[in-house]
Amino acid sequence: MNQHTLRITAHDQPTVLERLLQVTRYRGFVVTGMTMFPNKENALLDIEMSVRSEHSITHLQHQLDKLFDISDVTVDNILSQQVSA
């Protein structure tokens, strides 16, 4: 399986994490780690999410970008890492 890290900027809304996790799960990714820091100056959340899957990370990136409360999604490590079982 491939391991990826996403950096996400989102609006600080009550349902944003639920939507983020739901889309991630629907697309066949497993969340292996997540950190979130609120930015009170501009009402945004800075989220770093690690995921693993055999699916294309680009597809997940585009799906998350479509969410209303998501401002930006970038893949932190373009080259995937192989995770041993």
How would you name each of these model-derived features?
Residues 2-85:
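A conserved regulatory-domain signal marking ACT and ACT-like small-molecule sensing domains
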